[in-house]
From Swiss-Prot:
It comes from the Eukaryota. It is found in: Plastid, Chloroplast. Its main location: plastid. Protein S19 forms a complex with S13 that binds strongly to the 16S ribosomal RNA. Transmembrane segments: none annotated. One of its GO terms (molecular function) is structural constituent of ribosome. It comes from Arabidopsis thaliana (Mouse-ear cress). InterPro entries: Ribosomal_uS19 (IPR002222), Ribosomal_uS19_bac-type (IPR005732), Ribosomal_uS19_CS (IPR020934), Ribosomal_uS19_SF (IPR023575). It holds the Pfam family Ribosomal_S19. PROSITE patterns: RIBOSOMAL_S19. The keyword Hydrolase does not apply. Keywords: Chloroplast, Plastid, Ribonucleoprotein, Ribosomal protein, RNA-binding, rRNA-binding. This is Small ribosomal subunit protein uS19c.
Amino acid sequence: MTRSLKKNPFVAKHLLRKIEKLNTKAEKEIIITWSRASTIIPTMIGHTIAIHNGREHLPVYIIDLMVGHKLGEFSPTINFRGHAKNDNRSRR
């Protein structure tokens, strides 16, 4: 279910503070976060955010097309390696 338009998008406070601090200094550095549920807002455009996928932090450069999506969408947690091979030939 989508979030109500009356409510603001969810962004973790610590993440928002870090981005606003970098915007006032006009600096660009990698921001490390575990907050996959935070929504990407226009003030994040141009920053690189390292999003935790359960094992490591994956750096993601934020562009304007990502606004409105969640950070977790750009950091996959599962690496699909393909289905198991059908091993009927070795059984004969």
